[in-house]
Amino acid sequence: MSRTNLPIQPAKMSDATSSKPQIFSIQDLKQAASDKMSQMYRDYYNGGAMDNITLASNEAAFDRYLLRPRVLRNVSNIDMTTTLWGTKAALPLGVSPSAMHRLAHADGEVGTSKACAARNVPMILSALSNDTLEDVSGQSSDGSTPYAIQVSPFKNRQITTNLLSRAKAAGYKAVVLTVDAPMFGRRLDDLRNGFSIPPGFSFPNLSAQTQSGSGGLGGGIPDLSFDTAATWEEKIAWMKSQTDLEIWVKGVTSPLDAQIAIEQGVDGIIISNHGGRQLDTTPATIDILREIAPIAKGKTRIAIDGGFRRGSDIFKAVALGADFVFVGRIAIWGLAYDGSNGVGLALDLLINEFKLCMGLAGCSKISDITPAHLSILNAKGVLESVY
């Protein structure tokens, strides 16, 4: 049975405290977090576009990739570290940009960042954050945790230039341009719920002229018009003229676009279908990675998000050629469950599962993880190599 077909079971209650669920997996955390959120905000975070086909596919696709462990390997000392944006990271795992963390918990993006910094886990901050980018990166007291700022193709380019300037001054290492959202996807749950944000919500990283309007999401969202005429050639060249931060693009799902990204000289791509929130019935990102990695590996850095729920999912992505994995909803679930401490719990679950998977698969360092550690089950029930 696919993991997406498994019913969400209520988290177990301890004997000592019947109100405190025991969290042993991301699935447990999702349930506990969802129980704490209102329907409007729970559906906003958990839902996708239209019929949620891509949302479900992102998660279910991992079950097709089967682990092939190597045995009698020295795994007495497992090193999960890697590099991102020229900086050392604890493992190939980071937090994706997602808007308005204070909808989940008052700790907001600062709380998410605090948990990331304590574990040297990179974070991409959304332009639509509720905390200043300076306060967010300031949670890494020694500056060792890598941060990037996310931007969209705003029609008002002054928004982007302001963000780039502030991010550079605050020690950010990269800018991540979201390229799969020239307009907002149709999210039926948000429409049914009449999605809006609480009065008084602020977006301190945006210029004053954006602080009113609907922005296409719902009441109270800044009025951010997107440049629907943006093209690869013009947009990337302009970004390069504005900053010396690394430039990554997020939202690549076509091998053709991966090739163009390489030709335009971006520093990295993030294979992403926006968590199934933009165009429904696009392929699962882990399947797209299998297409794109042979084209892009060694020519640009490759990251991926979408559907990751286990440390073994991270392992599978690295085996298929990803340099890095990002998660979005998982951090939100942690935040909703217990603020910054909940984000830490979420990250620790994935970190511990990933380390265990490396050890059981016979890998003592990231470079040991190869396509030989995976097989895929074809329609005839026969195991095949992934490449």
UniProtKB/Swiss-Prot annotation:
GO terms for molecular function: FMN binding; oxidoreductase activity. PROSITE patterns: FMN_HYDROXY_ACID_DH_1 (PS00557), FMN_HYDROXY_ACID_DH_2 (PS51349). It comes from the Eukaryota. Fusaric acid is phytotoxic to plants such as cotton and banana. It has been shown to induce programmed cell death in plants. In addition to a mild toxicity to animals, fusaric acid exhibits acanthamoebicidal, antioomycete, and antimycobacterial activities. FMN binds at residues 126, 150, 178, 250, 305-309, 328-329. It is an enzyme of class 1 (oxidoreductase). A 2-oxocarboxylate binds at residues 44, 187, 277. Its cofactor is FMN. Signal peptide: none annotated. Belongs to the FMN-dependent alpha-hydroxy acid dehydrogenase family. PANTHER family: 2-HYDROXYACID OXIDASE 2, S -2-HYDROXY-ACID OXIDASE-RELATED. This is Oxidase FUB9. It comes from Fusarium oxysporum f. sp. lycopersici (strain 4287 / CBS 123668 / FGSC 9935 / NRRL 34936) (Fusarium vascular wilt of tomato).
